[in-house]
């Protein structure tokens, strides 16, 4: 037998997955912010194997870039084997073994559509496999309803004597509740030898990987099984219903992990957390919150309700309420929301504020500066301790190009100020309400625009006679005359 202490992993991801009814290859569908395949590859990488081989086939032009992207993040070599014709699991492993030429050790075979399988379970499988000399160890699970699965038949020594498919089992065999998961650990040398002896003499006309077990036993090699503690880890995803079910189980796992690590999640059923999200201690997450992508939440933050953060960094003690944010950073002790839209490239400094119905895009808001209400701020820099009045607009687009606005520190702008970029407002400047700023404003200046207010008496009654407005004006004048 081979040296059991070195390992390699084969991940099977060549199938068509027709039940997904999708233009996307099955294993590229996502739960928890990762594709099904990425979950499987991450679990495999958790073994720290010498090599991982992903077997691809159907729509491989879609799958190969995903394999390469995961390889760049897990710190483990992942090679690709192409199964040109989908001729069964045995054939898929034959294709993979070309990438493992000369490898001697334990070969784990798993699938690209089992996103809930943990590295720890694979490690337990390998440990069980290597504890005593073994040719094959099959990962099994116990089900209350095993209908449709291959049954695991053992002898008195606990060795697996057969995997009996549902259609081939007799009455006693079908009472067995331990079933085949489709995940195996093999001795590399015995696997390589047995693969060459497979035949397609079966109903499907394919090469079955499970036949390696019977070949190994026939040649006198021990075959064993290791039972997984949680059968849900081994649930395959073949259609959209199973995708949603797996996503819910994974989210429950991630939410519970966050709570065990010190976060308060008020309503776990309405809180969604992606796999790459990190959450500090004493964070409070209110209902309807989604933390997606590579979002990072520091200690003591309060999030939600009804908040979605994607690839966001939230520093300590920040409050984010009813906000959608993407690819941006919120500083310590900042206050965001409600009904705030944060677009990519925005940075809010310490003690900063983006208030109700504010949209920010590629905006740098300095320490202590506030944009409290009803404002669009795009392509802008705001210094420290400045205040932007309600209903202000940073007019950054001339129809062809985007332009930048720079606001200094300790600036106070009146409500309904328009900043026509490119423009700079110096430190300590003020603007009057309704000002349209088209030119740079010096530090400490007060800027106002527009002429003196002019009231044209009687205009409505003269130009809009008979309208409700004219009638109201006439009645008001009559009342004023009577009062006079």
Where are these regions (language model features)?
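Conserved alpha/beta core of the MobA/IspD/sugar-nucleotide pyrophosphorylase nucleotidyltransferase superfamily
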Residues: 2-5, 177-280
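Conserved N-terminal catalytic core of the sugar/cofactor nucleotidyltransferase
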Residues: 1-8, 34-110, 114-127, 466-469, ...
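N-terminal nucleotide-binding beta1-loop-alpha1 segment
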Residues: 1-22
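Structural signal for interior beta-strand "rungs" in well-ordered beta-sheet cores
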Residues: 264-449, 453-455
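Short glycine-enriched, charge-decorated loop/helix-capping segments at active-site entrances
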Residues: 24-30, 198-201
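Conserved core of the sugar-phosphate nucleotidyltransferase
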Residues: 61, 117-203, 210, 221
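Long, low-complexity, intrinsically disordered segments
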Residues: 476-484
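Structural beta-sheet core signal
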Residues: 9-11, 54, 108-109, 136-139, ...
């Amino acid at each position: 037998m081979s040296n059991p202490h070195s390992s390699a992993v084969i991940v099977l991801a060549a199938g068509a997955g027709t039940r997904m009814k999708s233009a996307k290859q099955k294993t590229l569908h996502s739960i928890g912010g990762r594709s099904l395949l990425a979950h499987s590859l991450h679990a495999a990488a958790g073994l720290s194997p010498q090599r991982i081989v992903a077997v691809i086939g159907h729509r491989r032009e879609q799958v190969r870039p995903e394999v390469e992207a995961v390889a760049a993040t897990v710190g483990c070599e992942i090679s690709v084997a192409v199964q040109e014709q989908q001729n069964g699991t045995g054939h898929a492993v034959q294709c993979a073994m070309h990438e493992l030429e000369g490898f001697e050790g334990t070969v784990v075979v798993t699938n690209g559509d089992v996103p809930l399988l943990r590295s720890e379970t694979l490690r337990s499988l390998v440990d069980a496999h290597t504890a005593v000399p073994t040719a094959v160890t099959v990962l099994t699970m116990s089900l209350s309803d095993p209908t449709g699965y291959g049954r695991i038949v053992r002898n008195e020594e606990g060795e697996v004597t057969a995997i009996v498919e549902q259609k081939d089992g007799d009455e006693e065999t079908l009472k067995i509740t331990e079933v085949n998961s489709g995940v195996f650990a093999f001795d590399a040398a015995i696997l390589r030898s047995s693969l060459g002896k497979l035949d397609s003499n079966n109903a499907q006309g394919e090469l079955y990987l499970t036949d390696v077990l019977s070949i190994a036993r026939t040649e006198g090699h021990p075959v064993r099984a290791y039972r997984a503690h949680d059968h849900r880890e081994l649930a395959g995803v073949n259609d959209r219903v199973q995708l949603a079910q797996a996503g819910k189980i994974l989210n429950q796992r991630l939410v519970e992990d966050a709570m065990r690590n010190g976060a308060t999640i008020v309503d776990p059923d309405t809180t969604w957390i992606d796999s790459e999200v990190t959450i500090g201690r004493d964070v409070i997450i209110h209902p309807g919150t989604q933390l997606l992508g590579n979002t990072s939440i520091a200690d003591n933050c309060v999030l939600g309700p009804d908040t979605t953060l994607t690839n966001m960094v939230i520093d300590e003690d920040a409050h984010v309420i009813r906000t959608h944010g993407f690819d941006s950073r919120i500083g310590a002790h900042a206050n965001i929301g409600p009904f705030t839209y944060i677009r990519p490239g925005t940075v809010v400094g310490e003690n900063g504020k983006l208030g109700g119905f504010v949209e920010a895009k590629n905006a740098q808001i300095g320490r202590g500066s506030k944009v409290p209400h009803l404002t669009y701020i795009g392509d802008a820099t705001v210094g420290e301790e400045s205040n932007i009045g309600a209903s202000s607009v940073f007019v950054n687009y001339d129809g062809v190009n985007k332009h930048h606005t720079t606001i200094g520190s300790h600036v106070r702008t009146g409500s309904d100020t328009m900043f026509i970029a490119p423009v700079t407002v110096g430190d300590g400047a003020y603007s009057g309400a309704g000002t349209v700023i088209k030119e740079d404003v010096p530090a400490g200046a007060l800027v106002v625009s527009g002429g003196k207010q002019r009231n044209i008496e009687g205009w409505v009654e003269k130009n809009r006679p008979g309208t409700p407005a004219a009638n109201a004006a006439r009645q008001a004048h009559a009342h004023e005359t009577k009062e006079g």
